[in-house]
């Protein structure tokens, strides 16, 4: 079974081929594909040759390898199977089976087959090289020592799997191979190889010898391929090395005991017998010396450059250094070439891949050092070469062996080996034996046979590739079908579950409908039975129905009658309701008329009362006028008497008797004029005080009535709330209550109108009095003379008070004093009480002025009476009379009141004095807003106030 391991960076592509095709017992030699079939323009050691043609070939093949390794492994028409990767216990078992088959064939096969199979076994199990095929850099590693690291790092990118071997494993494998190299006692093959190649290079070899070494080279490549397949098996690396060591020891033991030698060993012996003692190339001893110590040196740098990504897949067979003569000769060839790196460059140049485009490379001459071992020696390569040195074709095949397995192998159709260019003619001194040429010819014949067999195997492999591709497609299709089947199973399961649920639901519905149908049938049967039973009672039911129908007709007639009666009752009730409404309206109208008539009656009564009061006031005024006339008469008589007394005094006086009559006449005239002016001023003051008294009384009465009205309204609202809260009242009581409220409101309106009328009357009276006073003053001013120095004031209340004391002393009685006290109490109890009491200090301040004029006037007549009178006039002018001040307005009020006759003897805090004082102050304060009354009414009131006797307190309110 052939395992071709392909590496593409980190991907592994493992292709299994049937074992009987490659490793059949009848195969004389193991075959690995000739590189000329796959890489027609391939050149070993790329980048190290001076020939441009070789460099071109090398770069082209490198590009092929790097760009598409899988495509390089097989021709483009082959089907690619990138994912056919089969590893594990199967491959390991296949490798074990391969070992058993080889051992079995060694026991029972022919000597030639045993020789080939033994080479295969030793190559697969006992090689000391690394377990992976080397790339370009590992091949270059064999040609030079110092620059090999650079070439390795530069050429390792296209491959990925060969970096996965541990460095320690590499060193162990190399060290395990060294004792076998030293213990091998076979003669060195390098000398014979180099010698025969050198001699043969001087003359063109015949075609049969060219084919025979090619066959050997191919057998060697096939051994490498077997080891490459063995790499792909999954075994531990150390165990592979140990097992390979054990197999190698067994093979050495068999070889030393006299078993059949391999073909390469015979070629080596023949070449040594003929040419070994004659020709000595420089440095064969050095090549031997490298056997012990120089062997592992190329392996270690190659192992050091590996990528530390872990070990590769473990395979059962490690390619180690062969103990067989084939492996030994290869090693010696390598070590010899290590001593001559300069010759290696020129040795590789003459062997390009056999192709028509590269035939001109054959002009290059051969070099004597044998570098074939270097190209075929893969110290770490899994395919050592055997007899490749005997022909340029075999050397070229072996030179391509390193890259052949480091890159994917393209399966190309085999090409003729005869296309290789003939080497240039060698020197005539070098000659080769006839046995060597015969061996080469046989080898080339075997190469042709094996090439044909390889072509057949390639065709079979292509068929297997096709089958594998089909199988892969079948697997994909099968996977797709399985996935579709799984999805179908899932959907079918789901549908079945849904169908089952629906079926259960429908079955339940069917059962329910069956039960319902059964119930309906039972009901129908019972209904039928009841119907059949009722048919017997049909006659009785019909008779009862007739009776009920007649009764129903009667009831309907009665119902109609009742409805008619009900309609009549409803109409009557509506008429009654309308009549009631009409009566209510008439009652309300009558009540309104009654209210109006009551209001008119009240107004008429008020007018009647007013007329009566006015008549009383008129009579009082008339009496007052009469009394005034009497008082004037008395005053006149008193003044006449005083005048007579003064005249007599002047007559009896001693001083100025002559001028006295002249003086007395104008002086008396002036005195009379002044007295008259005083009288007029006093009358004006009295009128003003009367007006103010009337205004104050009206204000007090209005305030009292307003307070009473507010209290009545409050009581009315309380009663309204209490009556609205009670539910048992009738509509008649509500009407009565509304009427009472209307009456009260009308009364209040009438009172307000009366008060306004009184105020207007008072204002009219005041203005009439003012007009009269002004007219009198204007007349007096026109009739005055130029004696204005004797007129200090228009009015002197002290004289008026003094003159009134004698005439009115006896006019005040005890009853009048009691009435005045009563009026004082009522005035103090009114709303304006606080205002009157607050002004009492004016009484105390002005009372000391009261006795002064009394004393002055009541004193006996003295010569200084006129002087004292003048003093009193000036003092009274400063502190009192007509200037609208409190003291000025006080004295005329005292003189005009009936109590002024006793004011001199009345204490300051007596109610007689307090009453007019408080009244005057209050009148002044109340007069400031301008409460006016009609002058006629005021004149009547002023005349009435001069009456010595007042009827009562109610009469005072009426006068107001």
From Swiss-Prot:
Tell me which UniProt keywords the record has, alphabetically: Cell junction, Coiled coil, Phosphoprotein, Tight junction, Ubl conjugation, Wnt signaling pathway
Which segments does the entry list as coiled coil?
A: 261-281, 440-641, 667-697, 731-761
- Regions crossing the membrane: none
Q: Which family does it belong to?
A: Belongs to the angiomotin family.
Residues bearing the modification Phosphothreonine: 906
Q: Which compartments is it annotated to reside in?
A: Cell junction, Tight junction
Annotated protein name in UniProt: Angiomotin-like protein 1
Q: Which PANTHER family match?
A: ANGIOMOTIN, ANGIOMOTIN-LIKE PROTEIN 1
Give residue spans, biased composition: Low complexity: 388-401, 845-870
- As annotated in the record, motif PDZ-binding runs over 957-960
Q: Which Pfam families match?
A: Angiomotin_C (PF12240)
Q: Does the keyword NAD feature in the UniProt annotation?
A: no
Q: Name one GO biological process term.
A: hippo signaling
| Organism (species) | Bos taurus (Bovine)
Region described as Disordered: spans on this chain: 196-248, 277-317, 381-407, 413-432, 775-826, 842-952
User: Can you tell which superkingdom this protein's organism belongs to?
Assistant: Eukaryota
> How does the record describe the protein's post-translational processing?
Polyubiquitinated by NEDD4, leading to proteasomal degradation.
What does this chain do?
Inhibits the Wnt/beta-catenin signaling pathway, probably by recruiting CTNNB1 to recycling endosomes and hence preventing its translocation to the nucleus.
**Where Phosphoserine occurs along the chain?**
243, 271, 297, 722, 795, 807, 830, 904, 910
List all Polar residues biased stretches.
804-817, 898-911
Q: Name one GO cellular component term.
A: bicellular tight junction
**Keyword Coiled coil attributed:** yes
């Amino acid at each position: 079974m052939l395992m071709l391991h392909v590496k593409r960076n980190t991907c592994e592509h493992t292709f299994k081929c049937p074992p009987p095709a490659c490793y059949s017992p009848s195969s004389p030699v193991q075959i690995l594909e000739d590189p000329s079939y796959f890489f027609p323009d391939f050149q070993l050691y790329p980048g190290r040759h001076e020939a441009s043609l070789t460099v071109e070939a090398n770069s082209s093949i490198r590009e092929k390898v790097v760009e598409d390794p899988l495509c390089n492994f097989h021709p483009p028409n082959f089907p690619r199977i990138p994912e056919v990767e089969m590893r594990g216990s199967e491959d390991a078992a296949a490798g074990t089976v391969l070992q058993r088959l080889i051992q079995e064939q060694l026991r029972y096969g022919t000597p030639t087959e045993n020789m080939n199979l033994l080479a295969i076994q030793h190559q697969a199990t006992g090689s000391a090289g690394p377990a992976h095929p080397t790339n370009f850099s590992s091949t270059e590693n064999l040609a030079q020592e110092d620059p090999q690291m650079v070439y390795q790092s530069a050429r390792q990118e296209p491959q990925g799997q060969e970096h996965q071997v541990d460095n320690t494993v590499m060193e162990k494998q190399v060290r395990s191979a060294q004792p076998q190299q030293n213990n091998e006692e076979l003669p060195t093959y390098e000398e014979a190889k180099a010698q025969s190649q050198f001699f043969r290079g001087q003359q063109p070899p015949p075609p049969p010898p060219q084919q025979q070494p090619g066959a050997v080279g191919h057998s060697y490549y096939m051994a490498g391929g077997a080891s490459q397949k063995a790499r792909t098996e999954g075994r531990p690396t150390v165990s592979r090395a140990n097992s390979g060591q054990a197999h190698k020891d067994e093979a050495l033991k068999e070889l030393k005991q006299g078993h059949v030698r391999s073909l390469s060993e015979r070629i080596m012996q023949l070449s040594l017998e003929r040419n070994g003692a004659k020709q000595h190339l420089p440095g064969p001893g050095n090549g031997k010396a490298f056997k012990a110590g120089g062997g592992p040196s190329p392996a270690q740098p190659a192992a050091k450059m590996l990528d530390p990504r872990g070990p590769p897949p473990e395979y059962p067979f490690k390619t180690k250094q062969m103990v067989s003569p084939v492996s030994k000769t290869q090693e010696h060839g390598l070590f010899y070439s290590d001593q001559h790196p300069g010759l290696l460059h020129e040795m590789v140049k003459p062997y390009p891949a056999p192709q028509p485009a590269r035939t001109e490379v054959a002009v290059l001459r051969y070099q004597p050092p044998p570098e074939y071992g270097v190209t075929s020696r893969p110290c770490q390569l899994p395919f050592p070469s055997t007899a490749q040195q005997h022909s340029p074709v075999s050397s070229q095949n072996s030179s391509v062996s390193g890259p052949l397995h480091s890159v994917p192998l393209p399966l190309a159709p085999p090409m003729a080996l005869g296309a290789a260019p003939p080497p240039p003619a060698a020197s005539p001194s070098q000659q080769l034996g006839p046995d060597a040429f015969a061996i080469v010819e046989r080898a080339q014949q075997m190469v042709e046979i094996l090439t044909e067999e390889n072509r057949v195997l390639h065709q079979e492999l292509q068929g297997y590739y096709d089958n594998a591709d089909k199988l892969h497609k079948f697997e994909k299709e099968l996977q797709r079908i399985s996935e579709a089947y799984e999805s179908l199973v899932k959907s079918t399961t789901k549908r079945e579950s849904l169908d089952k649920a629906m079926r259960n639901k429908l079955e339940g519905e069917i059962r329910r409908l069956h039960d319902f149908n059964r119930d309906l049938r039972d009901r129908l049967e019972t209904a039928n039975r009841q119907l059949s039973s009722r048919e017997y009672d049909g006659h009785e039911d019909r008779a009862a129905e007739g009776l009920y129908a007649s009764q129903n007709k009667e009831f309907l007639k009665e119902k109609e009658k009742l409805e008619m009666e009900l309609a009549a009752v409803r109409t009557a009730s509506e008429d009654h309701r309308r009549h009631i409404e009409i009566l209510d309206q008439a009652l309300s109208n009558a009540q309104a008329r009654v209210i109006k008539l009551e209001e008119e009656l009240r107004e008429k009564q008020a007018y009647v009362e007013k007329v009566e009061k006015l008549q009383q006031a008129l009579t009082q005024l008339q009496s007052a006028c009469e009394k005034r006339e009497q008082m004037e008469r008395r005053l006149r008589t008193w003044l006449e008497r005083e005048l007579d007394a003064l005249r007599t005094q002047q007559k009896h006086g001693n001083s100025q008797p002559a001028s006295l009559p002249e003086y007395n006449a104008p002086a008396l005239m002036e005195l009379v004029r002044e007295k008259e002016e005083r009288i007029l001023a006093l009358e004006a003051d009295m009128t003003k005080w009367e007006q103010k008294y009337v205004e104050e009384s009206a204000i007090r009465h209005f305030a009292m009535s307003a307070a009473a009205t507010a209290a009545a309204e409050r009581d009315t609202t309380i009663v309204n709330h209490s009556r609205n809260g009670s539910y048992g009242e009738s509509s008649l009581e509500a009407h009565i209550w509304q009427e009472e409220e209307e009456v009260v409101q009308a009364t209040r309106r009438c009172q307000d109108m009366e008060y306004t009328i009184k105020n207007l009357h008072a204002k009219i009276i005041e203005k009439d009095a003012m007009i009269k006073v002004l007219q009198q003053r204007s007349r007096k001013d026109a009739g005055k003379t130029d004696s204005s120095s004797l007129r200090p004031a228009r009015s002197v209340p002290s004289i008026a008070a003094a003159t009134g004391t004698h005439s009115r002393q006896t006019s005040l009685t005890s009853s009048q004093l009691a009435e005045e006290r009563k009026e004082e109490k009522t005035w103090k109890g009114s709303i304006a009480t606080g205002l009157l009491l607050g002004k009492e200090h004016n009484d105390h301040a002005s009372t000391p002025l009261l006795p002064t004029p009394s004393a002055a006037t009541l004193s006996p007549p003295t010569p200084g009476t006129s002087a004292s009178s003048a003093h009193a006039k000036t003092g009274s002018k400063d502190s009192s009379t007509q200037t609208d001040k409190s003291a000025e307005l006080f004295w005329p009020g005292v003189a005009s009141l009936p109590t002024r006759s006793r004011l001199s003897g009345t204490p300051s805090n007596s109610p007689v004095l307090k009453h007019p004082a408080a009244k005057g102050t209050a009148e002044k304060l109340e007069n400031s807003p301008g409460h006016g009354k009609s002058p006629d009414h005021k004149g009547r009131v002023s005349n009435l106030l001069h009456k010595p006797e007042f009827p009562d307190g109610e009469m005072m309110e009426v006068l107001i």
